[in-house]
Amino acid sequence: MALFPQEALNDGVRKREVFGWAMYDFANSGYTTVVLTAVFNTYFVGVAAQGADWATLAWTLVIAASSLLVMLTMPALGAYADMHARKKALLGMTTAICVAATVALALVGRGDLWIAVVAMVISNVCYSYGESLTAAFLPELARPHSMGRVSGWGWSFGYFGGMLSLGLCLSYVLWAQARGLPATEFVPVTMLITASVY
């Protein structure tokens, strides 16, 4: 069975377009896996905030603030993208900013709380913008009865991409820890790995 059967796609949509769309999920899933879930959250609490009593709350507030920004601004951004046919351009711009902000996370050292906060808010807002913008392409790609199926292709690619990024990062972390390197040396490298895959 073909991976992207033509009958699931709208007329004129090429399979390589769907593949490219699904690969965006492959590329960006490392951000949530490594930055939000497995690596940087712990680094933020223990290193950037130096393990303070309020450190976990600070991380929660950073994520909440970035989510609130997205909630307040995404409707206007989406309307602009639709009205001016700028989805692809905005997706490219928000992706580039998210990648740059993820690279900036590599600059965070002990006590660099505000660098971490600013870079996290920017990266998470732009990641979320990218998620919404790429989802907006789905009706253009898939027939109405196949949207769930085509969306599932993107999700499955995303799982593979997230696991690849996490695998690369954890392999490096284990290598670095075996050599006695501190988190301030190996966690920044994992941010660069994540940004590179993105």
Tell what function each PLM region has:
Residues R149-V173:
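Glycine-rich segments within core transmembrane alpha-helices of 12-TM secondary carriers
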Residues M71, G92-D112:
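C-terminal ends and interior cores of transmembrane alpha-helices
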Residues A81-I97:
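Cytoplasmic membrane-interface "Motif A"-like loop-to-helix N-cap segments
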Residues T56-A79, A100, L166:
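Central cavity-lining transmembrane alpha-helices of secondary-active solute carriers
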Residues F4-S67, W114-V117:
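Helix-loop boundary and gating motifs at the non-cytosolic
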Residues A119-F157:
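Cytoplasmic helix-loop-helix junction between adjacent transmembrane helices
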Residues T184-Y198:
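Symmetry-related core transmembrane helices of the 12-TM Major Facilitator Superfamily/SLC fold
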